[in-house]
Each structure stands twice: as structure tokens, then as C-alpha cells.
Regions:
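Short, solvent-exposed coil/turn linker segments
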Residues: 19, 37-38, 147
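Residues in flexible loops and secondary-structure boundaries
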Residues: 21-23, 44-45, 55, 135
Length: 216
């Protein structure tokens, strides 16, 4: 049984009660457990908390490709929402999938640079500590999604960031950079131009990025 408790002094406790016969399984289930009190001396071994189960893990070539596939091939769903003026549909696919895959790729970059020996926290909450200020500021700027134009700009920038980071990860791990980028890039630019009548303030940078990636 679980109880979420907020006290008058604003201390918060998530209290879970379980049968004694489940104690061993509970202790084995999460290496972050720290024993504060064991009044009846029921725990017969030392419990040393560690976050090792949550360390960023080196992706296989298949996992890397799957991340790229998901990022690029969900982009058309975001674009569909933007073109149809269905902003919540666009935001949902952006945040739930496209952004998630970008953060996952950035976490692999962090893992490579730190020897895959640390965690970036739940929901990537510590990732700022391990990336450049420039990357962090650009990442934060993609969270402004209060208008169709801002979402388009966020999408262009997410593509730029993903292309740069995934290219670096591929190079460091000796994986092949997939072809999804080129076709989805063209589709994104064409749809933006068709439905907004603009070429986009990021268009030249966007084109330069994809051309540089092709040459590598």
C-alpha cells in the first residue's frame, strides 16, 4: 500500500507498506535503497546504495538506428498537426517522442564522454551538468511551443541538434549514420514552405547542416 503524504512543515513522504515476506525481494529490486532504521534487525546484509542500474548505457548499433528512426519518422506526425492547425496533436508527438529521442541521443553523447559511468537522472534532470552551455541553451529554446510558428522553429532546431549529436555519437561508436535525415529534412522544409509561405529563418543553416553531414 502506498501513501503520498505532505506534512504541515512541507516535508513530503511517499510511504509504502508491504508484508514482511516481501522484504527480501523489495531490497533486491532497487539498488538505490538506503536503510535508515531496522529496529528488529531483520536485514542480515549490508545495503550500500548505488545508482549503477541507472547509468547511461552504451547503445548497440540497432538501438542507435532505432533512436534515429523514431526521431525522424515521427516528425511527419508533428508536421501533420501543424499543417492541419491541430496544435495539441503536434505538441504531443513532439514532446512524447521526438524530444524524448533527442534527449536519449544527448544522453549517449554524455555517456561516451564520461565512460558510461553515471546517470543523468530521471527525466534527464541532471543532463545540464554534462553538456555545453550552448547545447543546453539551444535545447531549452525548443520548449517554447505557444504558437504554430514557435513549434516550427523548435522543430527545425531539434533537427539541427539531433543531426549534430547523432552524427557525433555515430562517429565515436563507429556506427553508420542513417539516411532518414535527408528525406525527412526535405519533407519538413517543403511542408513549411507550402503551409506558411515562408522558407524559414533557419533554412540556410538547416541546408548547410545536411550538406555537411552528407560529406562526412
Amino acid at each position: 500500500f502506498s501513501y503520498l503524504m505532505l506534512f504541515d512543515d512541507y516535508n513530503k513522504i511517499d510511504l509504502t507498506l508491504l508484508p514482511l515476506e516481501e522484504l527480501d525481494n523489495y531490497l533486491k529490486g532497487d539498488k538505490l535503497i538506503k536503510v535508515l532504521i531496522d529496529k528488529d534487525c531483520r536485514i542480515k546484509r549490508d545495503i550500500v546504495p548505488t545508482d549503477i542500474d541507472y547509468h547511461v548505457r552504451k547503445p548497440s548499433a540497432r538501438e542507435y538506428d532505432d533512436c534515429c528512426n523514431e526521431f525522424w519518422n515521427v516528425t511527419p506526425y508533428v508536421i501533420k498537426g501543424l499543417c492541419r492547425k491541430e496544435i495539441l496533436f503536434a505538441i504531443d508527438h513532439f514532446n512524447q517522442i521526438v524530444r524524448h529521442e533527442l534527449l536519449r541521443m544527448i544522453s549517449w553523447k554524455v555517456g561516451i564522454e564520461t565512460g558510461f559511468k553515471l546517470s543523468v537522472g530521471k527525466n534527464y534532470k541532471f543532463i545540464e551538468r554534462y553538456i555545453s552551455e550552448d547545447l543546453w541553451e539551444k535545447l531549452l529554446s525548443t520548449y517554447r511551443m505557444d504558437s504554430y510558428e514557435n513549434i516550427w522553429e523548435a522543430l527545425f532546431l531539434c533537427h539541427q541538434l539531433f543531426r549534430a549529436v547523432s552524427g557525433e555519437v555515430a562517429e565515436r561508436l563507429h556506427y553508420a549514420y542513417p539516411e532518414y535525415d535527408r528525406n525527412i529534412t526535405k519533407y519538413t522544409r517543403d511542408m513549411y514552405k507550402k503551409y506558411t509561405g515562408k522558407t524559414g529563418c533557419l533554412d540556410s543553416t538547416y541546408a548547410a547542416d545536411i550538406e555537411e553531414r552528407r560529406e562526412q
